[in-house]
Amino acid sequence: MARVNDDIDNRDASDAEFFSAPPFNPAEALVQLRRALRAVTGLTERAHRFEWKGRQAVTLTIDGERLQARLARRPAASPEWESRSLKNGAEVRKFGDDVRQRVSRWNNADE
């Protein structure tokens, strides 16, 4: 019986290595997130930030192994920022979804 359990334990370890996610690359994530945000209706890219109707809405910077992102609570000349430190692909996708939802809300309120 011990031999069967050893085989199962070894297989589980090799499966974990096979299915492990690649390490997070903030530079690559920045490129993908910028591409996704360019597709959001109402956002305009300027240098390392995105604007909504000429007002700052999103800023993105790389900080070591993380992507630092700031999202304006409301668009303004000097907005109140919501800061996030993105350290994996899931957090980057969630941030992109949050930006889309917030910009959609701003667009609807502006109409």
Which residues fall in each region the model found?
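Charge-dense, helix-prone N-terminal extensions
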Residues: 1-111
